[in-house]
Regions:
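Extracytoplasmic/periplasm-facing segments of secreted or lipoprotein envelope proteins
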Residues: 410-453
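Feature targets compositionally biased, intrinsically disordered low-complexity regions
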Residues: 49-50, 320, 332, 406, ...
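Alpha-helix boundary/N-cap detector
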Residues: 148, 152, 214, 330-333, ...
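Extracytoplasmic/secreted envelope proteins and their assembly/folding machinery
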Residues: 22, 183, 197, 216, ...
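Compositionally biased, low-complexity repeat tracts
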Residues: 3-5, 317, 403, 421, ...
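Functional cores of ribonucleases/endoribonucleases
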Residues: 445-565
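Intrinsically disordered, low-complexity Pro/Gly/Thr/Ser/Ala-rich repeat tracts
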Residues: 1-185, 189-427
């Protein structure tokens, strides 16, 4: 295609590729969604696999709470991927319409419909509770002694023996084999979402030139933001939540890390739970076996190997003696010790499961909304079409509206920067990056509160990109602001020419109040007073800060956010 619709470089991103990325992301969203639904289908096979006792009940409660929150975080991540898928199609359509407007003699452009995606968190079915395993508590111990003792008698003696000490408090024990199987069921979920995350990043790489530093950095930010990072994120609950993590290699993906690690650790804790159940079962069986051995020795049943009938007749007469002998030889101290070890391990595991909640809660706050990722994808796609050229090319219809003195396309401005190299050899003056979409579009009230918490500043956001562009356009259309902007731009051109240009220069624009709500804000004062109980306040205006671009000879919106006059 001809300039300005393409530029020099090793990768020439075309609208067709944006449609392909959009379609691929939609498929990956479905795969990410199915990874959890398939796991939950398997989980339904494991009802009533738990045991009795207060400690097993506590573990089951903690496990259920963690799984429920994991499902919530996973569902929000599904929605975020869908938003990204839609954003790439929107930009491809905007490009087609802009190209058609530039070349009216060409055949009319027909926009493609956005991909069918999940745009709100799915309602996943809760897995069945652990419950208490069905069956008689003593069934696991009826075969502890191969002495040919009749079933009813054996049951009577075993039950009486288990009543010594605390054994019956924890019976029936969990089905350790099924609990171990459930632990293994978590691992395919962890592997599956890992593969999908890799596919998703490969998809974005299709429209990324990693040899272009600004492009590469933007790609890393786009991918990491999909997994919950922000410009203000810090190291919280043991994870990096910033776009540019200060430690560790590569890109931070905290929400993905939480989902993956939680699955891995739940698998580990369930395996340890199963091992603890097996260990106490084995210990109690050994104690009973020893008691029966000693009881038979005391009773001198030397003819124990005779026929079943003779044995039955004889043991029947000795019921009271056998019971008394077993009870006499049961080691109550060892029984209680085995129970104590088991319950101590369960309490340890319960606390470990509870400890997973902090990262999950943070992840639930951090997952971006559908609206946020749609806007970010539009921005990344817009800039990729022109290889992150600093000469900005607006694409949306608003930028071509003759009623707008200054056309506006926030997506095409995102990541714009204006470093300046003075002609006299002074050091390079660092540019000011545009970040309206990344920091001020589609944030939830909880995300605004998290920003206040992390940065100690007021925080605000537009609900979506359309509202942001409407509010900013209103400010740009204000007649006084038009005069202010034109005067300011003329001065910037002169300063570029004489080498005195400062990238941070910005005109002081009038704040324009609209009838409609532009967004919401949470003040530091309110957060300091109420914490996460602070409520967002609706706003009807926006603060707009511009920056001048020497490369394009015009301005870009460095940032804009809802703010009361």
């Amino acid at each position: 295609m001809s300039s300005p619709w393409t530029g020099p470089g090793t990768i020439d991103v075309q609208p067709l590729q944006l449609y392909q990325v959009s379609a691929a992301l939609a498929v990956e969203q479905q795969s990410f969604h199915r990874a959890l639904t398939q796991f939950l289908d398997v989980h339904t096979w494991y009802a009533k696999v738990g045991g009795s006792g207060t400690d097993t009940a506590a573990f089951a409660t903690a496990y259920a709470e963690v799984v429920a929150l994991l499902m919530e975080v996973h569902g929000k991540a599904v929605v975020a991927i869908g938003g990204a898928a839609v954003g790439f199609t929107t930009t491809a359509n905007n490009f087609g319409q802009a190209d058609a407007a530039t070349h009216p003699g060409n055949p009319p452009f027909t926009p493609q419909p956005p991909p069918v995606v999940i745009d709100r968190p799915p309602t996943y079915p809760l897995p069945p509770p652990f419950g208490v395993r069905d069956g008689n508590p003593v069934d696991d111990f009826l075969d502890v002694f191969d002495g040919g003792i009749a079933g009813d008698l054996m049951r009577e003696v075993v039950e009486a023996a288990l009543r010594t000490g605390r054994a019956l408090e924890i019976l029936p024990l969990p089905d350790y084999l099924k609990v171990n199987d459930l632990s293994q069921a978590w691992l395919p979920l962890q592997t599956g979402i890992g593969m999908i995350q890799g596919q998703l990043q490969d998809t974005i790489n299709m429209v990324t030139n990693h040899e272009n530093a600004e492009w590469h950095i933007a790609m890393r930010q786009f991918v990491s933001s999909l997994w919950g990072t922000t410009a203000w994120g810090k190291n919280t609950v043991g994870l990096e939540w910033g776009h540019k993590p200060p430690t560790g290699p590569g890109t931070s993906m905290p929400v993905f890390a939480v989902l993956s690690t939680t699955a891995q650790l739940l698998a580990q804790y369930l395996r340890e739970y199963a091992e603890a159940a097996e260990a106490v079962r084995r210990a109690l069986r050994e104690i009973l076996h020893t008691a029966f051995q000693r009881a038979f020795a005391v009773l001198d049943l030397s003819d124990i190997k005779r026929t079943f009938k003779n044995l039955w007749d004889r043991v029947k007469k000795l019921t009271k003696g056998l019971l008394a002998a077993v009870l006499l030889n049961i080691d109550t101290g060892k029984v209680n010790e085995a129970v104590d070890i088991y319950e101590s391990k369960l309490r340890e595991l319960t606390q470990k499961v509870k400890n997973l909640m902090d990262q999950l809660r943070e992840a639930s706050i951090a997952v971006p909304t559908f609206q946020a990722e749609t806007a970010r994808a539009e921005a990344y796609a817009s800039r990729s079409l022109f290889e992150f050229d600093r000469s900005l090319y607006p694409l949306n219809a608003q930028s071509r509206d003759p009623n707008n003195h200054f056309g506006l396309d926030l997506a095409s401005m995102e990541w714009a920067t204006n470093p300046f190299q003075p002609p006299n050899g002074d050091p390079l003056r660092e540019g000011k990056d545009a970040h309206t979409i990344d920091r001020h579009v589609g944030l939830t009230p909880e995300q605004l509160k998290a920003r206040v918490r992390d940065q100690g500043v007021d925080a605000s956001a537009f609900p979506d990109l359309q509202t942001a562009e409407k509010a900013v356009q209103a400010a740009l259309n204000d007649q006084q602001n038009i005069t202010i902007i034109e005067t300011w731009m003329n001065k910037q051109k002169q300063k570029v020419a004489n080498g005195t240009f400062s990238p941070g220069s910005a005109p002081e624009l009038n704040v324009v109040t609209l009838t409609d709500v532009t967004g919401s804000t949470i003040s530091k004062a309110d957060f300091d007073a109420s914490g996460f109980a602070a409520q967002p306040v609706p706003v009807h205006s926006a603060k707009v800060i511009l920056a001048y671009s020497p490369e394009s000879g015009t301005f870009y919106v460095r940032t804009a956010f809802p703010k009361a006059p």
